[in-house]
Amino acid sequence: SLLELGKMILQETGKMPSKSYGAYGCNCGVLGR
């Protein structure tokens, strides 16, 4: 879900998902696995 993805991005980058989501949005599958 978006919430889980946001939490993962927040933990990985340590920044707000809103800013990093654009960059990691395409690579969410790679980070998810």
Swiss-Prot record:
Keyword Disulfide bond: yes
GO cellular component terms, A-Z: extracellular region
Keywords, comma-separated and alphabetical: Antibiotic, Antimicrobial, Disulfide bond, Myotoxin, Secreted, Toxin
Subcellular location field: Secreted
Tissue distribution: Expressed by the venom gland.
Transmembrane segments: none
GO biological process: arachidonate secretion; defense response to bacterium; phospholipid metabolic process
Source species: Bothrops marajoensis (Marajo lancehead)
This protein's name: Phospholipase A2 homolog BmarPLA2
Similarity comment text for this entry: Belongs to the phospholipase A2 family. Group II subfamily. K49 sub-subfamily.
Assembly: Homodimer; non-covalently linked.
Annotated InterPro entries: PLipase_A2_dom_sf
Molecular-function annotations in GO: phospholipase A2 activity; toxin activity
Highest taxon in the source lineage: Eukaryota
Function per UniProt: Snake phospholipase A2 homolog that lacks enzymatic activity. May display myotoxin activity. In isolated heart decreases cardiac frequency. Also decreases mean arterial pressure. Does not show antimicrobial activity. Does not change renal parameters (such as perfusion pressure, renal vascular resistance, urinary flow, glomerular filtration rate and sodium tubular transport).
